[in-house]
């Protein structure tokens, strides 16, 4: 029964792996719920800032901030949000394919591209492919704060201010539901027009110290909050993808255990049959 012992060892090994994947599935589910709460909490902040920016812009039509002005696109920047860890299916690779396809279109029209990367997966991917990486950060954990991202965002904003890039995008996985995560590219700069800016109503507010200074600060905060929102959404997507991947691994382990158990039972039955045959043959020989 040497074969039977090997199969029993394999079954025990797969059962141990199944326990690990099952535990990881439960942990990912818990973290996903927490990430969803953070995602929902951060949305109103960015929305309200965007509304205030629209109000100031409408009330101060003689001043156009550089972040609101379209210019010829010679250089494009992408802030790519990825995960620090794996075991989350094709979440990262699908995102990288999306941004590389978009970057290829920009390059085909004569534009240069550069990247700011968030997460160790994007850091290693874009550095290994020899892309121009202007800013990088990783190790944010499951509960990052907006201040963690300020430095990397500032590098890309400075490049925009200096005319080193003419358009800036944030690339992340958008959380739709547990089973669906969409690789998304949102334009940050120049600031896309909102519905508020399409209307002709002007708001009569008094700003201190002045509207222009306030607009400068708010636009930077808005860009930071949009990147932060992308990071939070990506975390929710990561945990959802990991939960699904670990559930699939747990289910596959169960199927493998059933198959191995069947093989073990057949091997055991064959061994018993062989032993009985030998006993009968021995008895016949003695008789």
Curated annotation (Swiss-Prot):
Superkingdom, natural source: Bacteria
GO aspect biological process, one term: proton motive force-driven plasma membrane ATP synthesis
Function statement: Produces ATP from ADP in the presence of a proton gradient across the membrane. The gamma chain is believed to be important in regulating ATPase activity and the flow of protons through the CF(0) complex.
Family under the similarity heading: Belongs to the ATPase gamma chain family.
Keyword Transport: yes
Cell compartments where the protein resides: Cell inner membrane
This protein's name: ATP synthase gamma chain
Record membrane topology: Peripheral membrane protein
